[in-house]
């Protein structure tokens, strides 16, 4: 959950309003958010997922233009690799179970029947199927998640921001499991005139650096 805005400053304003403790969710903390619109971007340590950019032939033109723009700002991103030896698909049951728990009332009340998309992998059926996830497999997935969090930290600890294509890799599911923030920015249109984007991954509680870039 996060802001959808037209400018970085708008994002900072909205994020600063919705972040932190609300007295209801005990998992939320009041972490610092020291956003400075005039910060020197050259002070940031920036990496990029070179292998994903090299393999993203669909959006290559727009990706290259985005990286060129970033370099014009005086930033020279360094190649980075994320963990790739863990079964992320197996850990997906964690996200499925958490999503189903969040929408438990919707499922129990049968109001999910009112949702239009009722295909096999649509959310209503995903939430229903989540009730059949074995507890043992869920616990084993949590153990793998701990390993993923440690490995992700070791791979990315030296960087304030990591640039990545929005699609084509496991970074979305990975950061969903580790809790690292992600900022998505439109960067043009493809041959079918569909909008394209590029993504920026940050450190835990590193939203200020993400928005500043």
Residue ranges and their predicted role:
Residues 150, 156-180:
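An extended, acidic, His-containing surface patch that forms the Zn2+-binding/catalytic region
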Residues 3, 9, 16-24, 51-54, ...:
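Generic secondary-structure signature for well-ordered alpha-helical cores
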């Amino acid at each position: 959950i996060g802001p959808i805005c037209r400018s970085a400053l708008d994002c900072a304003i909205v994020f600063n309003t919705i972040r932190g403790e609300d007295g209801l969710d005990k998992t939320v903390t009041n972490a610092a958010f020291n956003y400075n619109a005039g910060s020197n971007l050259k002070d940031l340590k920036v990496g990029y997922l070179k292998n994903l950019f090299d393999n993203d032939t669909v959006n290559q033109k727009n990706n290259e233009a985005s990286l060129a723009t970033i370099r014009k700002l005086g930033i020279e991103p360094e190649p980075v690799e994320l963990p790739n030896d863990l079964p992320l698909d197996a850990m997906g049951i964690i996200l499925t179970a958490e999503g189903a728990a969040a929408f438990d009332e919707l499922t129990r009340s049968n109001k999910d029947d009112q949702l239009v998309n009722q295909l096999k992998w649509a959310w209503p059926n995903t939430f229903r199927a989540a009730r059949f996830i074995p507890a043992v497999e869920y616990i084993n997935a949590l153990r793998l998640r701990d390993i993923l969090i440690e490995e992700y930290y070791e791979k990315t600890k030296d960087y304030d921001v990591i640039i990545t294509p929005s699609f084509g890799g496991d970074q979305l599911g990975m950061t969903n499991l580790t809790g690292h923030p992600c900022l998505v920015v439109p960067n043009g249109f493809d041959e079918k005139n569909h909008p394209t984007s590029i993504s920026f991954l940050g450190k835990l509680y590193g939203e200020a650096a993400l928005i500043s870039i």
